Amino acid sequence: MSVILGSGEHRYRVVENWGKLPDGWSFKDVAAVGVDSKDQVYVFNRGEHPVIVFDRDGNFLRSWGEGVFQRAHGLDIDKNDVLYLTDDGDHTVRRCTSAGKVELTIGIPGKPAPFMSGEPFHRCTHTALSPKDEIYVSDGYGNARVHKFSPAGKLIMSWGESGSEPGQFNIAHNIATDDAGWVYVADRENHRVQVFDGNGKYETQWNNLHRPCGLYCCRGKSPTFVIGELGPGMPVNLKAPNLGPRLSIVDAQGKLLARLGGKDGPGLEPGKFLAPHGLAIDSKGDIYVGEVSYTNWKTSFPDTPQPKTIRSLQKLARVP
């Protein structure tokens, strides 16, 4: 019997064992997922084949990026099926064709900016595009910053600093934009999503979240958002209920519409998550969830030996 998550208009069926890899291949952590105009699913992962492409039924199509990336972290795909891949291991953002040709590199591979200097980049995390194809980059692990670049990769401006006040960040982990040009930043360890105009002016924030990690905007005049939330990261609250890991669906004002999973902690059973890190949605409304399961295992299950293979990619099919 299929497992159904969510409620009301936001119900999803768990598609078990989605994504058929060639023999001997593995994802390791799936840091990010993207879907192009043909509903091809790009899986940006930390295995030997960094970009693996499937059709929406999970059939393997191709791979690329071998020898290019150091540590996969973020992926965004534009309307022309151009990919923006964020590598926090070598402090770069690469713009690539759907076949894997690198067209632009922002940042100097292997040369981070000084820690918390505010200069790009020190372990950048994700990208998003403005309606004018300007490139926003969340720079969240070694900085507390959002950078705005021209389509050619020239720095226009930056904003943010370490802290918990509006406009400050404690791990700017993910970033998204909508068709009106608003910028949404998953401020992970401040447990919120902050909303800015296209030039970094603070507008509002969404709370009622727990360590928001993945962030996806379902575009349109009244967009909804899917937010991947990590579970507790400390031994004292590790087994506390209702804190994730989970997905939350909210409207453009941050009002909660549905929650998927997360009531009784992490797990490998259908309907549970380990560490939802990257999100994408196809033309049918199905959700693809990339999880950093290997990285998270010891946090979630400190007393359980790590399995050799751990699920790190899920598909949730929307229920009509």
Residue ranges and their predicted role:
Residues 1-320:
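Eukaryotic scaffold repeat domains enriched in small/polar residues
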